[in-house]
Curated annotation (Swiss-Prot):
The keyword Amino-acid biosynthesis applies. Pathway: Amino-acid biosynthesis; L-isoleucine biosynthesis; L-isoleucine from 2-oxobutanoate: step 3/4; Amino-acid biosynthesis; L-valine biosynthesis; L-valine from pyruvate: step 3/4. Gene3D superfamilies: IlvD/EDD C-terminal domain-like (3.50.30.80). This is Dihydroxy-acid dehydratase. Keywords: 2Fe-2S, Amino-acid biosynthesis, Branched-chain amino acid biosynthesis, Iron, Iron-sulfur, Lyase, Magnesium, Metal-binding. It comes from the Bacteria. Its EC number is 4.2.1.9. SUPFAM superfamilies: IlvD/EDD N-terminal domain-like, LeuD/IlvD-like. Homodimer. [2Fe-2S] cluster binds at residues 122, 195. It comes from Haemophilus influenzae (strain ATCC 51907 / DSM 11121 / KW20 / Rd). The modification N6-carboxylysine is found at residue 124. The keyword Magnesium applies.
């Protein structure tokens, strides 16, 4: 029978000093011997996705203590990618993921906690906590802050739904009036919560459901809705139950590594492909799999992308649907239900509810279960009132959206595309692969041949796009922005948004060893591996080179001979794999990240071989 980890610091004569300190935190005599459960919060006033989390930790903690555990809350950092976007702050975004993972490990191991409830929400916080959960392998439940309501504004006598990407695109369009931009800016982000489309934050929170590590509804229930409170309360009760099953019944099936198996990672990736999620999810799933000891690779993602159809298009891939619409259509359980009916889900994986994924789908899929209370749960909708308060409204749609022919979620027979929403491309430009979000690419440009225009940084690319250097037919190459080369692997949301602003959204491609925001759409190909700083062929591209992109055949190639490529490589080896004429101040902390970082095909995790 596993011993409580916390017994290390709470039991025995020699731990009198530690117990004295535990007592000073409020522990009573009868608390010693109970599981100590870390409530890992990420409240901050910098991030709308986290601004409402201040009281959530104590909400969960109170429920844990009612159920027989001892709850101790601590906080992690949280970076807002949207606010950090377009300047040097973006260099810190991806490194913050690993810092969060480390900080959770430090706190939990230093204090010998027995289990965790992870209260996350935005882009790097959920992945960082997920990496920590897999690393620590103690009972863990994720409960996120929930999505923001979609923005709405009246323009040209039409009520238009908006999100933050609309504000970015319109602001750079010289033909758009200041008044229109102001109206969009003020309406795009109306409430607390993670940005309202299927951007990185919401994608990752949805994937925790598919992995089995969060409760049904976690990825889609709005932050503002009163029903979300029950997810926090239930997480507090359920984590105590998981502790009992593991520490009292020796049931290891409740541990993150037992839940997050290879099959579970396949389920998560299949969901991601079906919903056209953020390409960042690939990076984070690969990283989490490594922490879990699961051999899940780019080749597996490529294989899944060839058989899993695109069943839903959500903003930024369409203006029609946002996360509130996904929830109305049955949420992630609804999407997984359709994948199950198509024979594309492993139903035997475990979940934090203590049941198999198949059993969970029987209970929570609105197509197979007509229970009135279940449908009421998924009818939870937006109020359309500006607020930073969680659980502040109780509005509901009249009906759920169970239209699997033309609705927000489709069945396989009526799929938006039999091609999945994400694809892996290989070729002489990306020998270890690169990622494109096909759900956000117009099918007319799935095959694209263009002329390279090369930039050594995101900043130069932005100046080139807004300055008119980029023309129709160009492939914009932004290099030395990978995990090592940045360092930090910046998101390229501004370059992709500005291509749309300049009317080039369907007339150009963008290729980078950096990455993209979940808000990106268009022919944007990222995560090119190996990256330029690691000797990748993207570092050998020259202005005027022809680049061929072929999504249906999963290929991307630089149209020069092998001999010319070898000659260029030899020349670059002599010069060194560094950006030409780029002035960028890089802190010591970022240099450390860059030194240890692997390429994107490895999840941009730290290279452990450097420590041997």
């Amino acid at each position: 029978m596993p011993k409580l980890r916390s017994a290390t610091s709470t039991q025995g004569r020699n731990m009198a000093g530690a117990r004295a300190l535990w007592r000073a935190t409020g522990m009573k005599e009868n608390d010693f011997g109970k599981p100590i459960i870390a409530v890992v919060n990420s409240f901050t006033q910098f991030v709308p996705g986290h601004v409402h989390l201040k009281d959530m930790g104590q909400l969960v903690a109170a429920e844990i203590e009612k159920a027989g555990g001892v709850a101790k809350e601590f906080n992690t950092i949280a970076v807002d990618d949207g606010i950090a976007m377009g300047h040097g702050g973006m260099l810190y975004s991806l490194p913050s993921r690993d810092l969060i993972a480390d900080s959770v490990e430090y706190m939990v191991n230093a204090h010998c906690a027995d289990a965790m409830v992870c209260i996350s929400n935005c882009d790097k916080i959920t992945p960082g906590m997920l990496m920590a959960a897999m690393r620590l392998n103690i009972p863990t439940i994720f409960v996120s802050g929930g999505p923001m309501e979609a923005g709405k504004t009246k323009l040209s006598d039409q009520l238009i739904r908006l999100d933050l990407v609309d504000a970015m695109i319109e602001a750079a369009d010289p033909n758009v009036s200041d008044e229109r931009i102001d109206a969009i800016e003020r309406s795009a982000c109306p409430t607390c919560g993670s940005c309202s489309g299927m951007f990185t934050a919401n994608s990752m929170n949805c994937l925790t459901e598919a992995l089995g590590l969060s409760l049904p509804g976690n990825g889609s229930m709005l932050a503002t809705h009163a029903d979300r409170k029950e997810l926090f309360l239930k997480a507090g009760r359920q984590i105590v139950e998981l502790c009992k099953r593991y520490y009292e019944q020796d049931d290891a099936s409740v541990l993150p590594r037992s839940i997050g198996t290879f099959d579970a990672f396949e389920n998560a990736m299949s969901l991601d492909i079906a919903m056209g999620g953020s390409s960042n999810t690939v990076l984070h799933l690969l990283a989490a799999a490594q922490e879990a000891g699961v051999d899940f690779k780019m080749e597996d993602i490529d294989r899944l992308s060839r058989k899993v159809p695109c069943l839903s298009k959500i903003a930024p891939n369409t203006n029609k649907y946002h996360m509130e619409d996904v929830h109305r259509a049955g949420g992630i359980m609804g999407l997984l239900g359709e994948l199950d009916r198509a024979g594309l889900i492993h139903k035997n994986t475990h979940t934090v509810l203590g049941m198999s994924m198949g059993e969970q789908l029987d209970q929570y899929d609105i197509i197979r279960n007509q229970d009135e209370e279940l449908h009421k749960f998924f009818r939870a909708g937006p109020a359309g009132i500006r607020t930073t308060q969680a659980f502040s409204q109780d509005c509901r749609w009249d009906t759920v959206d169970n239209d699997r022919v033309n609705g927000c979620i489709r069945n396989k027979e009526n799929a938006i595309s039999q091609e999945g929403g994400l694809a892996v491309l290989f070729g002489n430009l990306a020998e270890d692969g690169c990622i494109v979000k096909t759900a956000g690419v117009d099918e007319s440009i799935w095959k694209f041949t263009g002329t390279a225009i090369v930039f050594e940084s995101q900043e130069d690319a932005v100046a080139g796009i807004l300055g008119g250097k980029v023309k129709e037919g160009h492939v914009v190459v932004i290099r030395y922005e990978g995990p090592k080369g940045g360092p930090g692997m910046q998101e390229m949301l501004y370059p992709t948004s500005y291509l749309k602003s300049m009317g080039l959204g369907k007339k150009c491609a963008l290729l980078t060893d950096g990455r993209f925001s979940g808000g990106t759409s268009g022919l944007s190909i990222g995560h090119v591996s190996p990256e330029a700083a690691s000797g990748g062929a993207i570092g050998l591209v020259r202005n005027g080179d022809i680049i061929n992109i072929d999504i249906p055949n999963r290929a991307i190639n630089l149209e020069i001979s092998n001999e010319e490529l070898a000659t260029r490589r030899a020349e670059q080896d002599q010069k060194g794999w560094q950006p030409a004429n780029r002035e960028r101040e890089v802190s010591f902390a970022l240099k450390v990240f860059g030194h240890f970082a692997t390429s994107a095909d490895k999840g941009a995790v730290r290279d452990k071989t450097l420590l041997k």
